Amino acid sequence: MPENVASSGLKNTNGQDITSLGEALNNAMEIIENDGVFFTPKSLVKMIVSVLEPKSGTLLDPACGSGGMFVQTGDFVNLAGMNANMVMTFYGQEKVEYNSRLCLMNIAVHGLSGKIKSGEEANTYYYDAHNLEGKCDYVMANPPFNVDKVKSESCQNAGRLPFGLPGVNKKTKEVSNANYLWISYFYSYLNEHGRAGFVMASSATDSQNRDKDIRGQLIKTGHVDVIVSVANNFFYTKSLPCSLEIEKTDKRDRKRLNAEWDAKIA
């Protein structure tokens, strides 16, 4: 256990129930942000979960960090009178092994269980570590913003790109900005009735070139449900403004929606 977690309140939890211990751990995560953990404010996580209203099924967070999406979902389901471990299956990918261990500890402290992959095999750009394309009822995530130097050929080979690659640097053959890789992944993981909620850099709402093309294709599906603008300086370690985006799919109706769209613009 990280030393500064133990000194931030956990040592005072003797006699407290597991929920109190979990709350102490959540509070500690705000303190250890400088140790490499990218903490997502609980209010943003809670909003995503409240909008998606998970009840049962498979939940994937392909950039799971310390596991906040799982914990909040567990709380939501349990408060609805169900047992989250009985009705939900949690899957996570987290490349940084320290963060994945913190995630496992976090969900365990909250009485939850999940399948968390870490290390290079959990690099979502290049691997679908749990083989969940098209199988998820829910996808929730706060991925890293504006990542560059992602190998385009490896991304292409890994699939999960229903709208194609975003912009690629012709000289280096690297993806210039990975925001729309993440957005494509979230969409591709959903099953026919899936719902996705995620945090994204606000620049993704009006980025140009291939990003604009992908955004147009996504909007054309009719599955973009809600976009909420989040003000600057909302995160503890980030000053960039961001947005919360919600997708709700019924992919069986995609052909019908496309036909209706084409008729409107004809």
Regions found by a protein language model. Give the residues of each.
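Non-catalytic, mostly N-terminal accessory regions of nucleic-acid modification and defense proteins
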Residues: 1-43, 47-50, 115-118, 123-126, ...
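A generic structural signal for ordered alpha-helices
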Residues: 3-6, 26-27, 37, 81, ...
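Unusually extended, aromatic-enriched hydrophobic runs near protein termini
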Residues: 4-16, 54-71, 218-251
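Residue-level recognition of well-ordered secondary-structure positions
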Residues: 22-25, 49, 104, 187, ...
